[in-house]
Amino acid sequence: MIDEKVCLQLIDSAIKVRDYSYSPYSNFKVGASILVDDFKIFSGCNIENASYGASNCAERTAIFKAVSEGYKVIHAVCVVGSFDEFTYPCGICRQVMLEFALNNSVPIIIAQSRENYIVHKLNDIVPFEFSKNNLI
Ligand code: THU
């Protein structure tokens, strides 16, 4: 469960950062936000590249920003895509979420707006995962 106020803060943050999306190739803007320790929120947008393969998804931008500033534990994730549809994280981003999530029940908020969103648990969108726990 996630507190509704925090959930709405995450959605606001993801919608705001989506404006900075650099996506001239797909024309698909994505914004993401994550909740870390101290109730701090990091956000990020997708950043594409002429080589396509060097593009970075919004979720990973937000996560890498947080980790590189010392926040390694994710308590919640929010993703807001474009057009009136729900945008789910790609496989690579799901794997990166597994690496830093507090646990498998971390809420993943898939939002279109403050009024229209779905909350999943990380484990729902990455069942049968391979993670660092397998290496211990
Ligand atoms: N994208 C994201 O940033 N996050 C997702 O969850 C799905 C896809 C980006 C990658 C690329 O820049 C564009 O959306 C189209 O795939």
Where are these regions (language model features)?
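Short beta-strand scaffold segments in enzyme catalytic cores
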Residues: 27-36
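Hydrophobic "anchor" residues
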Residues: 40-41, 116
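Compact, glycine-rich, soluble single-domain proteins
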Residues: 46-60
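Small-residue (primarily alanine) positions within well-ordered alpha-helices
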Residues: 14, 32-33, 62, 66
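Extended beta-strand/beta-hairpin segments
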Residues: 20-26
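Short, solvent-exposed cationic patches
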Residues: 58-78
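C-terminal binding/interaction regions
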Residues: 1-20, 71-136
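Short amphipathic alpha-helical face segments that pack within enzyme cores
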Residues: 57, 61, 92-95
